[in-house]
């Protein structure tokens, strides 16, 4: 099929997915093959230009992803950078990840999708995506297409050379962005080592490196963040991976920000979600939002910008 015909078909898929209707197995296979062709050209430290809107964990909460797009602007009108964890825990992992991948294939320059610790064969077999694929398709093929694709997702992104974005955090094995560029990412997320750390680590109030309670990655203190940012000419590390009740949370004297974009996480945590808008001068503002109204609930959205210089 020629490019023009495929683009037309892709637009129909996006339209269908926007209504939370899954694609069929063959369509998913085609989509994942096209996505691999695009992602294989992307770097472990993918360069992104502002303006861009940075988002944290989504975790299969499809209707809340729709709310995110309502508040932040539709793709491709708004440039997006998602920091991983598209699947597991929510009820619509299939539709959520398929839509994000379809948008990536349709508008490769307008959306960047990074790998989270849940974009893994092992984790998805425990936390819901595998079972959901089985339930919705009757076999594990779609799960296999996506988990094979996950190996191609970039690990980190760099916005205008200054804001470093990734799912988890820093690694004792990594001092510079060049160390990250040199990693071989085309594999299942390892149990330990630098690639694992980037997807699993968390900032901590204690200085230095610590053992992570998660059983993978490390905790890292403000001294580590400051040293890393200074050595690499960065102004900020932006990451996701942790539930924060306001949707975003500064730490390490504003060297690190956590962004979490799944409101009322697991449909019971009661948290707000947030996204971070970076304008063309890299000034940031956070937009917070509540869960999408479910059917029968009054439609109220909360758009509350907080501006910081």
Swiss-Prot record:
<dbReference type="GO" id="GO:0000278">
    <property type="term" value="P:mitotic cell cycle"/>
</dbReference>
<dbReference type="GO" id="GO:0000775">
    <property type="term" value="C:chromosome, centromeric region"/>
</dbReference>
<keyword id="KW-0479">Metal-binding</keyword>
<dbReference type="GO" id="GO:0006470">
    <property type="term" value="P:protein dephosphorylation"/>
</dbReference>
<feature type="binding site">
    <location>
        <position position="117"/>
    </location>
    <ligand>
        <name>Mn(2+) 2</name>
    </ligand>
</feature>
<dbReference type="InterPro" id="IPR006186">
    <property type="entry name" value="Ser/Thr-sp_prot-phosphatase"/>
</dbReference>
<keyword id="KW-0137">Centromere</keyword>
<dbReference type="GO" id="GO:0044325">
    <property type="term" value="F:transmembrane transporter binding"/>
</dbReference>
<feature type="binding site">
    <location>
        <position position="167"/>
    </location>
    <ligand>
        <name>Mn(2+) 2</name>
    </ligand>
</feature>
<dbReference type="GO" id="GO:0005634">
    <property type="term" value="C:nucleus"/>
</dbReference>
<feature type="binding site">
    <location>
        <position position="241"/>
    </location>
    <ligand>
        <name>Mn(2+) 2</name>
    </ligand>
</feature>
<dbReference type="GO" id="GO:0046580">
    <property type="term" value="P:negative regulation of Ras protein signal transduction"/>
</dbReference>
<keyword id="KW-0963">Cytoplasm</keyword>
<keyword id="KW-0904">Protein phosphatase</keyword>
<dbReference type="GO" id="GO:0004722">
    <property type="term" value="F:protein serine/threonine phosphatase activity"/>
</dbReference>
<keyword id="KW-0464">Manganese</keyword>
<dbReference type="Pfam" id="PF00149">
    <property type="entry name" value="Metallophos"/>
</dbReference>
<dbReference type="GO" id="GO:0000922">
    <property type="term" value="C:spindle pole"/>
</dbReference>
<dbReference type="GO" id="GO:0034976">
    <property type="term" value="P:response to endoplasmic reticulum stress"/>
</dbReference>
<dbReference type="InterPro" id="IPR004843">
    <property type="entry name" value="Calcineurin-like_PHP_ApaH"/>
</dbReference>
<keyword id="KW-0488">Methylation</keyword>
<dbReference type="InterPro" id="IPR029052">
    <property type="entry name" value="Metallo-depent_PP-like"/>
</dbReference>
<feature type="binding site">
    <location>
        <position position="57"/>
    </location>
    <ligand>
        <name>Mn(2+) 1</name>
    </ligand>
</feature>
<dbReference type="GO" id="GO:0043124">
    <property type="term" value="P:negative regulation of canonical NF-kappaB signal transduction"/>
</dbReference>
<dbReference type="GO" id="GO:0010288">
    <property type="term" value="P:response to lead ion"/>
</dbReference>
<dbReference type="GO" id="GO:0043161">
    <property type="term" value="P:proteasome-mediated ubiquitin-dependent protein catabolic process"/>
</dbReference>
<dbReference type="GO" id="GO:0010629">
    <property type="term" value="P:negative regulation of gene expression"/>
</dbReference>
<dbReference type="GO" id="GO:0046872">
    <property type="term" value="F:metal ion binding"/>
</dbReference>
<keyword id="KW-0539">Nucleus</keyword>
<feature type="binding site">
    <location>
        <position position="85"/>
    </location>
    <ligand>
        <name>Mn(2+) 1</name>
    </ligand>
</feature>
<dbReference type="GO" id="GO:0000159">
    <property type="term" value="C:protein phosphatase type 2A complex"/>
</dbReference>
<feature type="modified residue" description="Leucine methyl ester">
    <location>
        <position position="309"/>
    </location>
</feature>
<dbReference type="GO" id="GO:0031113">
    <property type="term" value="P:regulation of microtubule polymerization"/>
</dbReference>
<comment type="subunit">
    <text>PP2A consists of a common heterodimeric core enzyme (composed of a 36 kDa catalytic subunit (subunit C) and a 65 kDa constant regulatory subunit (PR65) (subunit A)) that associates with a variety of regulatory subunits. Proteins that associate with the core dimer include three families of regulatory subunits B (the R2/B/PR55/B55, R3/B''/PR72/PR130/PR59 and R5/B'/B56 families), the 48 kDa variable regulatory subunit, viral proteins, and cell signaling molecules. Binds PPME1. May indirectly interact with SGO1, most probably through regulatory B56 subunits. Interacts with CTTNBP2NL.</text>
</comment>
<dbReference type="GO" id="GO:0008637">
    <property type="term" value="P:apoptotic mitochondrial changes"/>
</dbReference>
<dbReference type="GO" id="GO:0090443">
    <property type="term" value="C:FAR/SIN/STRIPAK complex"/>
</dbReference>
<dbReference type="GO" id="GO:0048156">
    <property type="term" value="F:tau protein binding"/>
</dbReference>
<keyword id="KW-0832">Ubl conjugation</keyword>
<comment type="function">
    <text>Catalytic subunit of protein phosphatase 2A (PP2A), a serine/threonine phosphatase involved in the regulation of a wide variety of enzymes, signal transduction pathways, and cellular events. PP2A can modulate the activity of phosphorylase B kinase, casein kinase 2, mitogen-stimulated S6 kinase, and MAP-2 kinase. Part of the striatin-interacting phosphatase and kinase (STRIPAK) complexes. STRIPAK complexes have critical roles in protein (de)phosphorylation and are regulators of multiple signaling pathways including Hippo, MAPK, nuclear receptor and cytoskeleton remodeling.</text>
</comment>
<keyword id="KW-0206">Cytoskeleton</keyword>
<dbReference type="InterPro" id="IPR047129">
    <property type="entry name" value="PPA2-like"/>
</dbReference>
<feature type="binding site">
    <location>
        <position position="59"/>
    </location>
    <ligand>
        <name>Mn(2+) 1</name>
    </ligand>
</feature>
